[in-house]
Amino acid sequence: MAVPKKRTSISKKLIRKNFWKKRGYWTALKAFSLAQSIFTGNSKSFFCNK
């Protein structure tokens, strides 16, 4: 017999959502930092021809 699952609380839902938002923020920050270092020519980990 099928039993309905318990409802996920709002606080737990927000915690999970914020985790994903924070992860996206740090990834974007890292990408922006890499782009800045490439643009200024200070990159040591990324090689590109100018």
Curated annotation (Swiss-Prot):
The keyword Ribosomal protein applies. Transmembrane segments: none annotated. InterPro entries: Ribosomal_bL32, Ribosomal_bL32_plant/cyanobact. Keywords: Chloroplast, Plastid, Ribonucleoprotein, Ribosomal protein. GO terms for molecular function: structural constituent of ribosome. The keyword Translocase does not apply. Disulfide bonds: none annotated. This is Large ribosomal subunit protein bL32c. One of its GO terms (biological process) is translation. GO terms for cellular component: chloroplast; large ribosomal subunit. Belongs to the bacterial ribosomal protein bL32 family. The lineage of its organism: Eukaryota, Viridiplantae, Streptophyta, Embryophyta, Tracheophyta. It is found in: Plastid, Chloroplast. The gene is rpl32. It comes from Lotus japonicus.
